[in-house]
Each structure stands twice: as C-alpha cells, then as structure tokens.
Amino acid sequence: MNVEMFDFSIYISFFFSLFALVNPIGMIPIFTSMTNHQSIVERNKTNLIANFSVAIILSISLIFGSFILNLFGISINSFRISGGILVMIIAISMINGNFINNINNQKNGKLDKDIARNISIVPLAMPLIAGPGAISSTIVWSTHYSSVENIFGCMVTIMLFSCFCWTLFKVSPIIVDILGRTGINIMTRIMGLLLMSLGIEFILAGLKASCSNYF
C-alpha cells in the first residue's frame, strides 16, 4: 500500500468536518428530548439503531452518493432544501406541543409502538445527525479522495464518528435525571426553536447555492 496515499491527516480532517457539521454535543439535548419517554433499554436501542443507521447512511453516501443523486437527477442543493423542510416540520411539532402529546399518548398505549421506534432512523439518524450537510460533505470528500485506500480510511472514520456519537448519547439519561419532567418539556420547546432555525439555514443554504448557479 502506498503510505503517501494513506495520509492520516485526511481522516482527521474528515472526522472534525463531520463533528463540526453534526455538532453531536449540541445534539445531546435534542436526543434527550426525543427519548425522555423511553425506558433505559428502549433509549439504548434507539441510540444504537440511530448511530448504526448514521454509519450506513454516510458510508453509502461516501461510496454511491454522487451516483445515486445523478441517477435520480437530484442535486445536493435540492436535498438540502428538502431536509430543511423536514426539520422544520419536526420543529413545529416540538414547539406547539404535539410532540409531547404524542409521547403522552404512547405512554397510555394510544400510539403505535412502531412510531416511537421509528424516531431512531427518522428524524434522529436522518436528517438530524446524518443531515444534508454531513451527507453532501461526505460526497464531496469522496470526489476529492477517490482512491480505494482513502475510501476505506474514510469509512473507518465514519465508524469511529458514529461510535463517538453513541458514547455521547449514552450519557444523556443523566441529563434527564437532572432536569426532570418540567425541564425536559421546556427544553423540548427550546430545542424546537433551535431546530426551526436549523431547518431555515438548510433551506436558505440550498436556495442560495441554487440561485448562484443561475445568476
């Protein structure tokens, strides 16, 4: 193997680019808000499925991202806009209390358990963790470093990043115990506002990039 091609600085930079885009530390309150109704076992399962899904999503994006988008004629900017809209819908449900009501209904047996389980993939894994920014960055990274060695190194980096996120989310129950039910309800609405801003940023970034292509 060519040692020069296997440059570890590439993977360190890739890891920190994912860290900056995803901001897993800032995701802890969001994860806590979305899983505070779950038992410890359910929360750990959600955490595992979410981060395992993130590893798969980013790995697929790394290997097949450009091909898939081109195959369906979808631009990264369009994907960013659609992801922003989805984040905004989730944020609205958190702000107006529907998300909390769904949690209470689930506790009373009125909500399908599949709905509660599905948050591990949507919205946690995508678009909140593996969002348009992380996916598009991964695709761009694969175009710059397309050798087999670098693709393999980036895949290992993705696995390590997912394990890092899993570790951070693992300690989230401590936050739940400290804040209590009232604190979680307040934080849920605050996180809804932040998610609303994040969704708007996704949409504006996609629109700005799209407009720059035409003007």
From Swiss-Prot:
Q: Which UniProt keywords apply?
A: Cell membrane, Membrane, Transmembrane, Transmembrane helix
A Pfam family assignment: MarC
Q: Any one cellular component term from GO for this entry?
A: plasma membrane
What is the recorded membrane topology of this protein? Multi-pass membrane protein
Query: Where is this gene product found?
Result: Cell membrane
Residue stretches spanning the membrane:
10-32, 52-74, 78-100, 119-141, 151-169, 190-207
- UniProt-listed InterPro entries: Multi_antbiot-R_MarC (IPR002771)
Q: Which family does it belong to?
A: Belongs to the UPF0056 (MarC) family.
Protein's recorded name: UPF0056 membrane protein bbp_248
Which species is this record about? Buchnera aphidicola subsp. Baizongia pistaciae (strain Bp)
Task: Give the taxonomic lineage as stored in the record.
Answer: Bacteria, Pseudomonadati, Pseudomonadota, Gammaproteobacteria, Enterobacterales
